[in-house]
Swiss-Prot record:
Organism: Shigella flexneri
Disulfide feature: none
MF GO annotations: translation elongation factor activity
Protein name: Elongation factor P-like protein
Pfam families: EFP (PF01132), EFP_N (PF08207), Elong-fact-P_C (PF09285)
GO cellular component terms, A-Z: cytosol
Gene designation per UniProt: yeiP
SUPFAM superfamilies the record matches: Nucleic acid-binding proteins, Translation proteins SH3-like domain
Amino acid sequence: MPRANEIKKGMVLNYNGKLLLAKDIDIQSPTARGAATLYKMRFSDVRTGLKVEERFKGDDIVDTVTLTRRYVDFSYVDGNEYVFMDKEDYTPYTFTKDQIEEELLFMPEGGMPDMQVLTWDGQLLALELPQTVDLEIVETAPGIKGASASARNKPATLSTGLVIQVPEYLSPGEKIRIHIEERRYMGRAD
């Protein structure tokens, strides 16, 4: 069984009789000597959908669950439901808007390549996105000529409604690459 410091976003733990899907992990390093590093993890309870927060020491042993991952394509929206189609056997997977609210901030219209659904024992758990996505800037303050030497940032609204910090020299209409997990600008898209 792995230790708490080996847990990554998207893994599922069997903890206190609950199946918990890791959504976010904060690492808190201690200032006192001999104190253990704490891992504050935010989970989504697979069965109830409720948000759960737990703290672990780095060397705590946790019980993980092996998931089935299937590559999918975005198919269509039906009211409040988003339907994804399995790339191999064309099985439809349906999520409500609430279940994938975070993921929708990074998903361009028409979907994106390398999306996966996570299932366990025939139960649909989560939608997993690739590490990066290319999105277009739709709104930001105008670019400042000669600002490429400065390291200042400004907020930019992207085509999906997501707001992130970008360098000052970028302007609306440009496509940029975003690191999804860290919600950070990586560079201009090819």
